Amino acid sequence: MDILLNLINYSNNLKSQIKNNNNPENGSIVVLLSNISNDFEEIKDLQYKQQQQQQQNPNNIIKTFSNTIFKRIKHFISISINFGIKTIATKLLLIKKRKNITSSTSTSTCTTITIDKIINTILFENLNIIIKLLSLIEMIIIREYNYCKNTITQQQQQPILIWIGNSTNNNNKNKKIKIINLESIEKSINYLKTIKQQNKNTRIIIDNDIPLDHIKQLLSQFNNFPINIICFKNKCKNNEKEKKEEEEDHDHDHDDKKKEKEDKEKEEEEEEEDSNDDFEINDYITFLSIDFNNHFISLSNTEILYDYFINSMNYKPKFITTTTTTTTTTVNGSKNSSNTTTPITTKDDIDLDSDGEKKESDDDDDDDLTDEDTSQHNEIYSTSPKVSHSTFCQSSPTLLDLDLQQQQQQQQQQNDKIGGQQEKQITPNRSYTIRNMKPVSNQRYYSTPNKTVIINQQQQQQQQQQSSTSPSISPSSSNIKSEPNFARIDYKTSMFISNKPVAITTGKVATTQIHLRDALDNPVPTNLTSSNPSGFGPISSSPLHLTLLGPTNEILPFYCFVVGSGIFGISFFPTIHGIYTLSASLDYNNNNNNNNNNNNNSNNNNGIKKDLSIKNSPTIFKSTADGIISPNEIRSLHNSNEKKRKLPLLDFESTSNDSIDLLDFIIDSVDKNNNNNNNNNNNNNNNNNNNNNNNNNNNNNNNNNNNNNNNNNNNNNNNKENHNQNQNEIENENKNENENENENDKNGIIFINQNLNKEFNESSPEMSPTLQVEDDSNISAVNNDSSEIEATLAI
């Protein structure tokens, strides 16, 4: 809640920074950004008046004015990161800010030009969007506060947003904030007069198609009406032309004119690009998506979440290449091979004309926003991968290789004359690396003199289309080769770091960790986690199957990244209040070697696939507005998933602290079970002693169940006594070591009592029964503070 209150206070401070002098009184807040040039010219006049009165340097005024605004924007970005919003101004705003400050400081003689350059930057064009976004955030904050408050008071106070201007959509399905669309100022005035009570949860946003004169008429109606009004208009082109003509009349230097024209033309092009962005506003808004060169704003929706992760990567594969190699053998034994590569364009690179025909778009370097070097997209590379003979046959060049190369070059020249296309190859994703990469002038080919190579076309398309950059990719579809370390991973010791229901905050990114361990509780450093640094992502979750279910039982996407050697990090974005369950199970295909030993001890399985869920799966997350769960909710959530999680029941009567650790209750419950078990063991020992005494006294008080044992084993009574005593000591030691193990767990300790099986009694004393003990000592090593993990996505 502190972050939300800081966000409200910051929005009010930002609005007061650009507040007009004609604000109504009695607490109503009015922000006028109707015409950016006119509004900031008034600010410029005020600065000149202050400069004349105080006789200060105008450059200092410009610097102080720009620095305060930039500090506000940086503060807003930091708050928005904590709030879980991917905002604008990460690249455009800060980069343009540096350029404009250097230009303003260099031209210190002409103050009017420097102020215009500062005013007409993308910074001030984005201020209206930031203020509008803040007003929408305030409405969502009011709604969430009322939602939490209505659970007790059961009052309905719905926030209303009055949108004056043109709206694109009028859908009334499952939206969060009610929006009343009014096309003109007259309709809005008539509507506001019909409102009987002054609603504090009402906001007004005036769109850019309303003229300034009409806005002033609307302001006259709000003398005593506590409504937050956001007015914004973009720059008018007619006013710009008039200003250009006036400046051309006053200016005399032709060089200065050319520079000014070039600067203004660039600014106009940037403004036109920004003005093309459409705002999809509905009656009940769910999210606001503003596109500034792949920078998205998402507030609250589960459908936009997938695009939220995908578009943050800023990567689009332009081509998908399919390679087919055929080799023919003649009667004389000579081989003729041909290798053809055809690029297939994706949907992102194909546009539809008005006639319905497909038209290929131009390949601009600006479309590819990856961190990779763009030169590799314009060059042809040849690879020489060092792999086994199952994929490619690598050998030293021979005379036959040279003959094949010459034949292939001749065939390629003939194909080029006919109209063959030149090969163009692009790596399918950023995680795919090409080793031994070197540019050549010829086309890519593989020399295979001793073996015929046939590449499956469908298999290669699956490898390139289903890349590991998708955050919700499953390990079975990733086509990753099973490495030797996968056989070491054991589902009994691999675990989530959090073993109790975790409280998370709606609107913040929640993270957890998964540790891959073997049967001896040692970490398993896979190639993917050990070769990449911490924070690298997105990656595939192989060899784990991960599923994330939301409050409405829908499958949600998640983001998988590297935390350390053998440690996965899982992040997701909770957008609504409710319970999120993240479950993980071991991939059955990638762990066949490890499962063969376990299948022998599972009643032969009868052909049924065994449940390979890792420890603490599923992990439960409760998302609320304040990120707090009561102890009763923890107990109910824990007990509801007891069958799946194989954990004991909780007892909250012993403690009164709100910050409860699940390990305390596990230890307490196990101590109680151990006390009961010790009592049972003492009773068992007494019963065994009594039975042994009865056997030594010629079986005077034999039971019906032990007649056969006493008749067949009269000569081995002393050995059985010693064996039973040793067996009870082993049981007590194993029970004390496994305090966190439940008594009723199927994979837990097998308690051995006085009624042993007939097979064991008939066997020799050397063949002692084996104890199936699951090592659960990892749970005690978990840090208590690591259960509630909150992370933010870096912009």
Curated annotation (Swiss-Prot):
Biased composition (Polar residues): 377-398
Compositional bias (Low complexity): 326-345, 399-414, 455-480, 673-729
Keywords: Coiled coil
Biased amino acid composition, Acidic residues: 265-278, 362-373
Chain spans, region Disordered: 242-278, 326-430, 455-484, 673-743
Molecular function, one GO term: transcription coactivator activity
GO biological process, one term: positive regulation of transcription by RNA polymerase II
Chain intervals with Basic and acidic residues compositional bias: 251-264, 732-743
GO-annotated cellular components: mediator complex
Coiled-coil intervals: 228-280
PANTHER family according to UniProt: C2H2-TYPE DOMAIN-CONTAINING PROTEIN-RELATED, MEDIATOR OF RNA POLYMERASE II TRANSCRIPTION SUBUNIT 12
Entry protein name: Putative uncharacterized protein DDB_G0285031
Source organism of this protein record: Dictyostelium discoideum
